[in-house]
């Protein structure tokens, strides 16, 4: 799995992606990271990558010609790469989308800055626009890291226990509550069913709690599980 990241702040990477499970997988060669400095494709001595928007308005936009040269260089080396632009205007990034992206094998993530990028870049190169949520952050780098982390976890060999992926939130509803030692802490005890060692009862309890939590917090997710959106259980 190859991720090409186009950014004006290449030193931000790998950042958090260099730690824990995803970082170990990077060092083992289970996925690779190719960070491309957009400024290196600027044509002036100041390495200018932005300009004022036509029609006026606040802020600056990243220039189409500079971005175009940067993207072309990546496409020359990786002609089959999937182009993704992290943008608050994009479609909401989900676990299902993460699964789909992994199948491409080679992904190029364009990280916007300032007020965004010249729209012609999205149109000419047919970028898939992806948003990590209904909020605005300073740039696309953190969003790109979220996308990469989510995708890398599903690469074969990255997560040792495959059941961990199958039981996570959003696979089909939200994840059930989990507990570890001590059995009692600050007057709160672990549910008895988890202490009895009956695997069937444990699974039934987990399914029930997953359903209850999903109904209360994210009923929209139940549509993908063949459930109803309305109603919640207080049992």
From Swiss-Prot:
Official protein name in the record: tRNA (guanine-N(1)-)-methyltransferase
Location in the cell: Cytoplasm
Highest taxon listed in the record's lineage: Bacteria
Binding site for S-adenosyl-L-methionine: 112, 132-137
Lineage: Bacteria, Pseudomonadati, Pseudomonadota, Alphaproteobacteria, Rickettsiales
Keywords per UniProt: Cytoplasm, Methyltransferase, S-adenosyl-L-methionine, Transferase, tRNA processing
General function of this protein: Specifically methylates guanosine-37 in various tRNAs.
Record-linked Pfam families: tRNA_m1G_MT
Primary enzyme class: transferase
Similarity comment text for this entry: Belongs to the RNA methyltransferase TrmD family.
Molecular function GO labels: tRNA (guanine(37)-N1)-methyltransferase activity
Catalytic reaction list: guanosine(37) in tRNA + S-adenosyl-L-methionine = N(1)-methylguanosine(37) in tRNA + S-adenosyl-L-homocysteine + H(+)
InterPro entries hit by this protein: Alpha/beta_knot_MTases, tRNA_m1G_MeTrfase_C_sf, tRNA_m1G_MeTrfase_TrmD, tRNA_m1G_MTases_N, tRNA_MeTrfase_TRMD/TRM10
């Amino acid at each position: 799995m190859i991720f090409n990241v186009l950014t004006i702040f290449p030193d931000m990477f790998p950042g958090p992606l260099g730690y824990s499970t995803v970082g170990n997988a990077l060092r083992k060669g289970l996925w690779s990271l190719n960070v491309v400095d957009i400024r290196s494709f600027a044509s002036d001595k100041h390495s200018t990558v932005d300009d004022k928007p036509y029609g006026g308005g606040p802020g600056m936009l990243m220039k189409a010609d500079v971005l175009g040269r940067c993207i072309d260089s990546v496409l020359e080396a990786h002609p089959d790469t999937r182009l993704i632009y992290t943008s608050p205007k994009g479609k909401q990034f989900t676990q299902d989308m993460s699964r789909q992206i992994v199948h491409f094998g080679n992904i190029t993530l364009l990280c916007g800055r300032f007020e965004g990028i010249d729209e012609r870049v999205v149109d000419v190169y047919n970028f898939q626009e992806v948003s990590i949520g209904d909020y605005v952050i300073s740039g696309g780098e953190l969003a790109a890291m979220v996308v990469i982390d989510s995708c890398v976890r599903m690469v074969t060999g990255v997560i040792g226990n495959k059941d961990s992926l199958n039981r996570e939130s959003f696979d089909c509803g939200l994840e059930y509550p989990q507990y570890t030692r001590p059995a009692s802490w600050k007057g709160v005890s672990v549910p008895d069913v988890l202490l009895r060692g009956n695997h069937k009862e444990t699974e039934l309890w987990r399914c029930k709690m997953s359903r209850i939590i999903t109904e209360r917090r994210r009923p929209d997710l139940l549509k993908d599980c063949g459930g109803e959106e309305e109603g919640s259980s207080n049992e």
